[in-house]
Amino acid sequence: MASAPSVTSLADEVNCPICQGTLREPVTIDCGHNFCRGCLTRYCEIPGPESEESLSCPLCKEPFRPGSFRPNWQLANVVENIERLQLASTRGLEVEDACPEHGEKIYFFCEEDEAQLCVVCRETGQHGAHTVRFLEDAAGPYREQIQKCLVCLRKEREEIQETQSRENKRIQVLLTQVATKRQQVISQFAHLSQFLQQQQTALLAQLEGLDGDILKQQEEFDSLATGEICRFSTLIEELEEKNKRTARGLLTDIRSTLIRCETRKCRKPEAISPELGQRIRDFPQQAIPLRQEMKTFLEKLCFELDYEPAHISLDPQTSHPKLLLSEDHRRARFSYKWQNSPDTPQRFDRVTCVLAQCGFTGGRHTWMVNVDLAHGGSCTVGVVREDVRRKGELRLRPEEGIWAVRLAWGFVSALGSFPTRLALEEQPRKVQVSLDYEVGWITFVNAVTQEHIYTFTASFTQKIFPLFGLWGRGSSFSLSCQEGAVSLL
C-alpha cells in the first residue's frame, strides 16, 4: 500500500488550478489543461474584456472557446483511484483538514467569521460578501502576531528563569547561612556544656572537700567535747559525793578539792575553725569564672549569629607587584622581586597592599587573617573605601579612607591619624576583623585569646573593601574561615 506522503503527492498532481481542490468531473480545454467542470463553467461566466467567442486559459492564457471543453474520463478514473488510496491510507484516522459539513478539503479562511471553508462553503451566500483568503495567505498575519507573542513570551520566560535561578541561588545562600548558624549554635553549646560539666565537677569536688573537712572537724570537736564532759562529770560526782559526807568527812581535804574546782579551766572547743568557715564563706567566689564564661558565651553566640562570615578572596587586579598570590587567591607572600603585572588603574604601585575581590555596602561581616611574619616584617589588616588612592604615596589613616592595624615584629599599632602602639598581652598571630557598616565599627580581635585589639568608629557612605598589606621577605598571610572568635564590641 502506498504511504501517506506518496498518496498526498499524487493528489497534488490532480488538483484543479482554479479551486486548488481535487478535480471534480475533470474537463480538458484546447490547450490541454484540466479543470473542474463547475469551476471552468463559473470562470466562463465571469464578465471580462474577452469576447464571448474566445476566453484565455487561467494557467497559460491560451485562447479557448467556451463550449469547446470536453470530459476527461481517463483523468476522472485516476482521480477516483487516488481518492480510494487516500481513503485507505487514512482509514481509522480522523481527517482533520476535511470540512465537517461537506467532506471537502478545506482551502479557505473567512476573516469576518474566522471560519475555515471548503470550496462548497465559499460558494454559499453566507460568506459571499466576506473577505475569504487561502489558508496560507490568511495564516501569514497571524503567524506574524504569533512571532511577536513568542518574542515577548520567550523574553518573559527568560526573565522568570533568571529570577528563578537568582532566587534559588539566594535560597541556597540562606540555607548555607542557616546551616552555618546551626553548626555555630551546636558548637557553642557543646563548648558551654563541656565547660559547665568541668565547672560542676570542680565545684562539687570543692564542696566534697568542704564536706569532708567539716565532718573531720566535727569528729575532732565531738572527741574534745566528750573528754571535757567526762572530766566535768568526774569532778561533779566527786563534789556530790563529798557533799553527802558528814562534816568531818566533808572538811577532810576540802581545801585541795575546792582548789581543783576553782583552778579548773573550762575549754570550749569550736566546732568549725575560722579558716574552714572562711573557706565556706568564700565558696561563692568560685562561681565567678562561671559567670564570666556565661557572659563570654552569650557575647560569642550573639556575635556569631549576628555577623555573617565573609568568604573573601584576594583581587589580583589590585595586588602590588611585590605580593605573590596563591592560585586560590587566599594567601599572599612578600617578595622583593617585582612580578610582571600590568599597571592597571586598580593596582597599588607604591604601598604593598591588595584588596579583597568583593566589598560591602551594608550589614555585619567578619573574616579571619592568619599572620606569619619574618624578622623585621609587618602585616596590615583593615578596610578601605572603594575610591582609595592606588597610585603614588599613600598614608594609611582614616583621612585617606583607610581603617587598619599594623602587626609588626614585636608590636601592634592602630593606624589612626597618628599611629598608636597598643599594649597587648600577646602578639596576635590570628586576627579577626569585624565590620558593622551601619553602626560604623571596625573591630580587631586576637582570634586565639579573644583579646580586643582595637575598634575604629567611622561613617560609611561608599562600598568598603577588606585591605591587606605586607612587608618583609618571608612574611605572609592567609585568609581562613571563621572559627568562632568573639569581638568585644
Swiss-Prot record:
- Coiled coil (residue ranges): 144-180
What is the species of this protein? Mus musculus (Mouse)
Ranges annotated as B box-type zinc finger: 94-135
Describe its assembly: Interacts with IFNAR1; this interaction prevents association of IFNAR1 with TYK2.
Which UniProt keywords are given for this protein, alphabetically ordered?
Answer: Coiled coil, Cytoplasm, Metal-binding, Zinc, Zinc-finger
Q: Name one GO cellular component term.
A: cytoplasm
Explain what the UniProt record notes about the effect of disrupting the gene for this protein.
Answer: Deletion mice inhibit hypertrophic remodeling after transverse aortic constriction surgery.
The protein's name is Tripartite motif-containing protein 10
Q: What does the protein in this record do?
A: E3 ligase that plays an essential role in the differentiation and survival of terminal erythroid cells. May directly bind to PTEN and promote its ubiquitination, resulting in its proteasomal degradation and activation of hypertrophic signaling. In addition, plays a role in immune response regulation by repressing the phosphorylation of STAT1 and STAT2 in the interferon/JAK/STAT signaling pathway independent of its E3 ligase activity. Mechanistically, interacts with the intracellular domain of IFNAR1 and thereby inhibits the association between TYK2 and IFNAR1.
Example GO molecular function: zinc ion binding
Q: What is its main location?
A: cytoplasm
